[in-house]
Amino acid sequence: MAVPKKKTSKGKRNQRHAVWKAKAGDAAQKALSLGKSILSGRAQGFVYPIQEEDSEE
């Protein structure tokens, strides 16, 4: 069975954890910004279907 030869240092572990947390923070910030733009109506990247009125009746 494969095992690591040496223990990973706390510094390396913390560095990897910080990178992971930074990516999660960036994703959360992007999602929040996108949600705000959708709610305010300033979103340019979405196509909303136009509700057509029933004129056949």
UniProtKB/Swiss-Prot annotation:
Disordered, as annotated region: 1-23
Keyword Ribonucleoprotein: yes
Gene Ontology CC annotation, any one: large ribosomal subunit
Organism domain of life: Bacteria
Pfam family, one: Ribosomal_L32p
Compositionally biased intervals (Basic residues): 1-20
InterPro entries, alphabetized: Ribosomal_bL32, Ribosomal_bL32_plant/cyanobact, Ribosomal_zn-bd
Gene Ontology biological process terms, A to Z: translation
UniProt keyword terms in alphabetical order: Ribonucleoprotein, Ribosomal protein
Presence of keyword Nuclease: no
MF annotations from Gene Ontology: structural constituent of ribosome
Coiled coil region boundaries: none
SUPFAM superfamilies, A to Z: Zn-binding ribosomal proteins (SSF57829)
Family assignment from sequence similarity: Belongs to the bacterial ribosomal protein bL32 family.
HAMAP family xref list: Ribosomal_bL32
Protein name, per record: Large ribosomal subunit protein bL32
Gene name tied to this protein: rpmF
